[in-house]
């Protein structure tokens, strides 16, 4: 299992290049251009309350732009903000789950706040204990010619970069063809269930 993991240079990491991440301006970009990089940096260097507020507001705006778009394309349909927002809905949960544009801004803001609080807890954990490889939630990347396109673990990557780590440890690295094969196997597995 150890052979599958690599320590990759934080300077060679770019964000997942899915359609709606690209439309938002950070898909396929290096760490310093990710919106949440800025929020994490504000939190670590200055003020967690300000970072929390900016991050939540950004997530709410992104949600209303991309709430009907599939997560597989970088959208937010049935993603974390959506899921946490539903927890605050009193009536019509099922309808709001199927059509997130029915959610009001207050519930989406509460859902986004839950997610940001989890990210801030992650930040504190990395600061206090150092970065820990999580086998239950591995970070995966696709190796291109001279970069690594992260397919998950973006917040962890941003934190270690801000803290000065030169490498992000324990990343499962795929070639592009192997990643595409993996995606198809997952689709087939879902279909067979």
Regions found by a protein language model. Name each.
Residues 44-103, 108:
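Extended, charge-rich helix/loop segments that form flexible
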Residues 87-151:
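Short alpha-helix boundary/capping and kink motifs at helix termini
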Residues 6-9, 24, 53, 72, ...:
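Generic serine detector
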Residues 5, 15, 52, 82, ...:
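Histidine (H) residue identity feature
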Residues 2-65, 134-187:
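A short, basic-hydrophobic beta/loop patch
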């Amino acid at each position: 299992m150890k052979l599958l993991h690599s320590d990759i240079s934080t300077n060679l990491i770019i964000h997942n290049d899915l359609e709606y991440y690209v439309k938002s301006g950070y898909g396929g970009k290096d760490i310093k251009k990710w919106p949440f990089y800025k929020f994490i940096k504000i939190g670590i260097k200055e003020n967690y309350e300000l970072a929390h507020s900016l991050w939540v507001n950004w997530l709410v705006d992104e949600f209303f732009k991309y709430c009907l778009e599939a997560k597989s394309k970088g959208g937010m349909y049935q993603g974390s903000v959506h899921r946490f927002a539903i927890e605050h809905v009193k009536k019509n949960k099922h309808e709001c789950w199927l059509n997130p544009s029915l959610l009001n801004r207050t519930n989406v803001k509460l859902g986004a706040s839950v997610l940001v609080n989890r990210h801030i807890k992650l930040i504190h954990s990395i600061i206090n204990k150092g970065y820990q490889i999580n086998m239950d939630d591995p970070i995966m990347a696709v190796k291109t010619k001279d970069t690594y396109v992260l397919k998950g673990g973006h917040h962890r990557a941003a934190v270690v970069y801000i803290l000065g780590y030169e490498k992000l440890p324990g990343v499962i690295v795929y070639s592009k063809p192997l990643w595409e094969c993996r995606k198809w196997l997952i689709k087939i597995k879902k279909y067979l269930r």
